Amino acid sequence: MVKKSYPEVKEEYKKAVQRCKRKLRGLIAEKHCAPIVLRLAWHSAGTFDVKTKTGGPFGTIRHPQELAHDANNGLDIAVRLLDPIKELFPILSYADFYQLAGVVAVEITGGPEIPFHPGRLDKVEPPPEGRLPQATKGVDHLRDVFGRMGLNDKDIVALSGGHTLGRCHKERSGFEGAWTPNPLIFDNSYFKEILSGEKEGLLQLPTDKALLDDPLFLPFVEKYAADEDAFFEDYTEAHLKLSELGFADKE
Protein backbone atom coordinates (compact mmCIF):
# COMPACT_ATOMS: atom_id res chain seq x y z
CA MET A 1 0.00 0.00 0.00
CA VAL A 2 1.15 3.54 -0.75
CA LYS A 3 1.73 5.39 2.51
CA LYS A 4 -0.54 8.42 2.88
CA SER A 5 -0.17 11.73 4.65
CA TYR A 6 -3.59 13.37 4.44
CA PRO A 7 -3.78 17.17 4.35
CA GLU A 8 -5.33 19.08 7.23
CA VAL A 9 -8.71 20.48 6.24
CA LYS A 10 -10.66 23.10 8.17
CA GLU A 11 -13.56 22.17 10.43
CA GLU A 12 -15.90 24.13 8.15
CA TYR A 13 -14.81 21.93 5.21
CA LYS A 14 -15.33 18.70 7.20
CA LYS A 15 -18.84 19.82 8.13
CA ALA A 16 -19.59 20.61 4.48
CA VAL A 17 -18.47 17.07 3.55
CA GLN A 18 -20.93 15.57 6.05
CA ARG A 19 -23.82 17.79 4.91
CA CYS A 20 -23.02 17.08 1.27
CA LYS A 21 -22.99 13.34 2.01
CA ARG A 22 -26.55 13.57 3.34
CA LYS A 23 -27.73 15.46 0.25
CA LEU A 24 -26.03 12.92 -2.03
CA ARG A 25 -27.79 10.05 -0.23
CA GLY A 26 -31.13 11.70 -0.88
CA LEU A 27 -30.45 12.40 -4.55
CA ILE A 28 -28.97 8.99 -5.36
CA ALA A 29 -31.84 7.18 -3.60
CA GLU A 30 -34.48 9.32 -5.31
CA LYS A 31 -33.02 9.15 -8.82
CA HIS A 32 -31.79 5.52 -8.69
CA CYS A 33 -28.55 6.83 -10.16
CA ALA A 34 -25.95 4.99 -8.03
CA PRO A 35 -24.50 3.08 -11.01
CA ILE A 36 -23.71 6.11 -13.16
CA VAL A 37 -22.45 8.09 -10.15
CA LEU A 38 -20.06 5.26 -9.27
CA ARG A 39 -18.92 5.13 -12.90
CA LEU A 40 -18.22 8.88 -12.81
CA ALA A 41 -16.07 8.53 -9.67
CA TRP A 42 -14.17 5.57 -11.14
CA HIS A 43 -13.58 7.17 -14.53
CA SER A 44 -12.45 10.37 -12.84
CA ALA A 45 -9.82 8.47 -10.82
CA GLY A 46 -8.86 5.72 -13.27
CA THR A 47 -6.87 8.02 -15.56
CA PHE A 48 -3.95 8.17 -13.10
CA ASP A 49 -0.50 7.28 -14.37
CA VAL A 50 1.80 6.22 -11.54
CA LYS A 51 4.98 7.00 -13.54
CA THR A 52 4.14 10.51 -14.76
CA LYS A 53 1.84 11.34 -11.81
CA THR A 54 -0.73 12.74 -14.25
CA GLY A 55 -4.49 12.17 -14.39
CA GLY A 56 -6.39 10.85 -11.38
CA PRO A 57 -9.27 11.90 -9.13
CA PHE A 58 -8.82 15.65 -9.40
CA GLY A 59 -12.12 16.86 -10.82
CA THR A 60 -11.04 17.27 -14.46
CA ILE A 61 -13.87 15.00 -15.63
CA ARG A 62 -16.27 17.94 -15.32
CA HIS A 63 -14.62 19.53 -18.38
CA PRO A 64 -16.33 18.89 -21.75
CA GLN A 65 -12.95 17.90 -23.23
CA GLU A 66 -12.67 14.88 -20.87
CA LEU A 67 -16.39 14.05 -20.99
CA ALA A 68 -15.97 13.77 -24.77
CA HIS A 69 -13.57 10.81 -24.39
CA ASP A 70 -15.21 7.63 -25.78
CA ALA A 71 -14.91 5.81 -22.44
CA ASN A 72 -16.96 8.58 -20.80
CA ASN A 73 -20.02 8.38 -23.08
CA GLY A 74 -23.10 9.21 -21.01
CA LEU A 75 -21.22 10.58 -17.99
CA ASP A 76 -22.36 14.12 -18.82
CA ILE A 77 -25.71 12.87 -17.40
CA ALA A 78 -24.05 12.16 -14.04
CA VAL A 79 -22.29 15.54 -14.00
CA ARG A 80 -25.61 17.29 -14.68
CA LEU A 81 -27.44 15.24 -12.03
CA LEU A 82 -24.86 16.12 -9.39
CA ASP A 83 -24.41 19.80 -10.30
CA PRO A 84 -27.32 21.15 -8.19
CA ILE A 85 -25.80 19.55 -5.08
CA LYS A 86 -22.29 20.79 -5.89
CA GLU A 87 -23.73 24.31 -6.16
CA LEU A 88 -24.89 24.04 -2.53
CA PHE A 89 -21.30 23.35 -1.42
CA PRO A 90 -18.98 25.75 -3.27
CA ILE A 91 -16.35 25.18 -0.56
CA LEU A 92 -15.81 21.57 -1.74
CA SER A 93 -13.43 20.78 -4.59
CA TYR A 94 -14.95 18.90 -7.53
CA ALA A 95 -12.22 16.33 -6.92
CA ASP A 96 -13.51 15.57 -3.40
CA PHE A 97 -17.15 15.92 -4.43
CA TYR A 98 -17.07 13.28 -7.19
CA GLN A 99 -15.16 10.79 -5.02
CA LEU A 100 -17.55 11.39 -2.11
CA ALA A 101 -20.46 10.71 -4.48
CA GLY A 102 -18.86 7.38 -5.47
CA VAL A 103 -18.53 6.37 -1.82
CA VAL A 104 -22.20 7.22 -1.19
CA ALA A 105 -23.31 5.30 -4.31
CA VAL A 106 -21.76 2.09 -2.96
CA GLU A 107 -23.00 2.54 0.60
CA ILE A 108 -26.61 3.46 -0.27
CA THR A 109 -27.05 0.36 -2.46
CA GLY A 110 -26.06 -2.02 0.34
CA GLY A 111 -22.32 -2.09 -0.24
CA PRO A 112 -19.49 -1.48 2.22
CA GLU A 113 -18.72 1.89 3.81
CA ILE A 114 -15.57 3.16 2.16
CA PRO A 115 -13.39 5.57 4.15
CA PHE A 116 -13.26 9.08 2.73
CA HIS A 117 -10.41 11.54 3.31
CA PRO A 118 -11.00 15.10 2.04
CA GLY A 119 -8.40 17.50 0.70
CA ARG A 120 -8.03 16.76 -3.03
CA LEU A 121 -7.37 19.88 -5.06
CA ASP A 122 -8.92 20.46 -8.48
CA LYS A 123 -6.63 20.29 -11.49
CA VAL A 124 -7.25 22.10 -14.75
CA GLU A 125 -5.62 19.89 -17.36
CA PRO A 126 -7.59 16.77 -18.41
CA PRO A 127 -5.53 13.60 -18.98
CA PRO A 128 -4.99 12.23 -22.50
CA GLU A 129 -7.67 9.91 -23.87
CA GLY A 130 -7.19 6.14 -23.82
CA ARG A 131 -6.25 5.44 -20.20
CA LEU A 132 -9.47 3.68 -19.12
CA PRO A 133 -10.28 -0.04 -19.55
CA GLN A 134 -11.94 -1.13 -22.81
CA ALA A 135 -14.73 -3.68 -22.51
CA THR A 136 -13.70 -5.62 -25.62
CA LYS A 137 -10.18 -6.43 -24.41
CA GLY A 138 -8.71 -9.29 -22.39
CA VAL A 139 -6.40 -10.10 -19.49
CA ASP A 140 -3.24 -8.32 -20.69
CA HIS A 141 -5.18 -5.12 -21.29
CA LEU A 142 -6.64 -5.18 -17.77
CA ARG A 143 -3.19 -5.65 -16.23
CA ASP A 144 -1.71 -2.89 -18.40
CA VAL A 145 -4.42 -0.37 -17.57
CA PHE A 146 -4.65 -1.06 -13.83
CA GLY A 147 -0.89 -1.54 -13.52
CA ARG A 148 -0.42 1.94 -14.98
CA MET A 149 -2.62 3.23 -12.14
CA GLY A 150 -0.53 1.29 -9.60
CA LEU A 151 -3.24 -1.32 -8.85
CA ASN A 152 -2.74 -5.10 -8.59
CA ASP A 153 -4.57 -8.31 -9.57
CA LYS A 154 -6.68 -8.40 -6.41
CA ASP A 155 -7.74 -4.78 -6.98
CA ILE A 156 -8.68 -5.57 -10.60
CA VAL A 157 -10.99 -8.43 -9.63
CA ALA A 158 -12.49 -6.62 -6.62
CA LEU A 159 -13.22 -3.48 -8.66
CA SER A 160 -14.74 -5.60 -11.44
CA GLY A 161 -17.29 -6.62 -8.81
CA GLY A 162 -18.58 -3.04 -8.93
CA HIS A 163 -20.38 -4.19 -12.08
CA THR A 164 -22.93 -5.60 -9.64
CA LEU A 165 -24.39 -2.09 -10.07
CA GLY A 166 -25.82 -0.82 -13.30
CA ARG A 167 -26.04 -1.92 -16.91
CA CYS A 168 -24.49 -1.28 -20.31
CA HIS A 169 -26.24 0.95 -22.82
CA LYS A 170 -25.79 0.25 -26.51
CA GLU A 171 -25.47 3.92 -27.39
CA ARG A 172 -22.68 4.43 -24.81
CA SER A 173 -20.55 1.29 -24.98
CA GLY A 174 -21.93 -0.79 -27.84
CA PHE A 175 -23.14 -3.40 -25.31
CA GLU A 176 -26.63 -3.76 -23.83
CA GLY A 177 -27.89 -5.26 -20.58
CA ALA A 178 -27.22 -5.65 -16.84
CA TRP A 179 -24.65 -7.95 -15.25
CA THR A 180 -26.94 -9.11 -12.43
CA PRO A 181 -30.68 -9.60 -11.85
CA ASN A 182 -30.78 -6.60 -9.48
CA PRO A 183 -28.59 -3.79 -10.85
CA LEU A 184 -29.39 -1.40 -7.98
CA ILE A 185 -28.06 -3.66 -5.21
CA PHE A 186 -24.36 -3.81 -4.35
CA ASP A 187 -23.52 -7.42 -3.46
CA ASN A 188 -21.36 -10.31 -4.70
CA SER A 189 -23.83 -11.49 -7.35
CA TYR A 190 -21.55 -10.31 -10.20
CA PHE A 191 -19.09 -13.09 -9.33
CA LYS A 192 -21.82 -15.71 -8.97
CA GLU A 193 -23.21 -14.74 -12.37
CA ILE A 194 -19.93 -14.86 -14.29
CA LEU A 195 -19.10 -18.25 -12.76
CA SER A 196 -22.50 -19.69 -13.67
CA GLY A 197 -22.11 -18.95 -17.38
CA GLU A 198 -24.10 -16.82 -19.81
CA LYS A 199 -27.81 -16.37 -19.12
CA GLU A 200 -30.65 -15.00 -21.19
CA GLY A 201 -30.97 -11.26 -20.59
CA LEU A 202 -27.76 -10.82 -18.56
CA LEU A 203 -24.53 -9.37 -19.86
CA GLN A 204 -20.98 -10.69 -19.85
CA LEU A 205 -18.32 -8.51 -21.45
CA PRO A 206 -15.02 -9.82 -22.83
CA THR A 207 -13.31 -8.19 -19.81
CA ASP A 208 -15.65 -10.13 -17.46
CA LYS A 209 -14.87 -13.43 -19.14
CA ALA A 210 -11.15 -12.59 -19.00
CA LEU A 211 -11.34 -12.92 -15.20
CA LEU A 212 -12.20 -16.61 -15.65
CA ASP A 213 -9.46 -17.23 -18.23
CA ASP A 214 -6.58 -16.23 -15.98
CA PRO A 215 -5.14 -18.56 -13.30
CA LEU A 216 -4.34 -15.60 -11.02
CA PHE A 217 -7.70 -13.82 -11.40
CA LEU A 218 -9.92 -16.92 -11.11
CA PRO A 219 -9.21 -17.73 -7.41
CA PHE A 220 -10.35 -14.22 -6.44
CA VAL A 221 -13.55 -14.63 -8.49
CA GLU A 222 -14.28 -17.95 -6.75
CA LYS A 223 -13.47 -16.53 -3.32
CA TYR A 224 -15.74 -13.50 -3.76
CA ALA A 225 -18.61 -15.61 -5.17
CA ALA A 226 -18.44 -17.81 -2.06
CA ASP A 227 -17.81 -15.11 0.54
CA GLU A 228 -19.41 -11.68 0.29
CA ASP A 229 -17.58 -10.42 3.39
CA ALA A 230 -14.24 -11.18 1.73
CA PHE A 231 -15.39 -9.34 -1.39
CA PHE A 232 -16.54 -6.30 0.60
CA GLU A 233 -13.24 -6.17 2.50
CA ASP A 234 -11.12 -6.29 -0.67
CA TYR A 235 -13.47 -4.01 -2.60
CA THR A 236 -13.23 -1.38 0.15
CA GLU A 237 -9.44 -1.45 -0.02
CA ALA A 238 -9.41 -1.30 -3.84
CA HIS A 239 -12.01 1.48 -4.09
CA LEU A 240 -10.14 3.51 -1.46
CA LYS A 241 -6.87 3.09 -3.41
CA LEU A 242 -8.56 4.07 -6.68
CA SER A 243 -10.21 7.13 -5.12
CA GLU A 244 -6.87 8.33 -3.73
CA LEU A 245 -4.53 7.69 -6.68
CA GLY A 246 -1.93 10.45 -6.64
CA PHE A 247 -3.56 12.07 -3.57
CA ALA A 248 -1.73 12.54 -0.25
CA ASP A 249 1.08 10.14 -1.19
CA LYS A 250 4.06 10.23 1.15
CA GLU A 251 7.22 10.84 -0.84
Swiss-Prot record:
PROSITE patterns: PEROXIDASE_1, PEROXIDASE_2, PEROXIDASE_4. Pfam families: peroxidase. One of its GO terms (biological process) is cellular response to oxidative stress. It catalyses: L-ascorbate + H2O2 = L-dehydroascorbate + 2 H2O. The keyword Calcium applies. One of its GO terms (cellular component) is cytosol. The active site is at H43. It is found in: Cytoplasm. Detected in bundle sheath cells, the photosynthetic cells that surround the phloem and xylem. Binds one cation per subunit; probably K(+), but might also be Ca(2+). Belongs to the peroxidase family. Ascorbate peroxidase subfamily. This is L-ascorbate peroxidase 2, cytosolic. It comes from Arabidopsis thaliana (Mouse-ear cress). The lineage of its organism: Eukaryota, Viridiplantae, Streptophyta, Embryophyta, Tracheophyta.
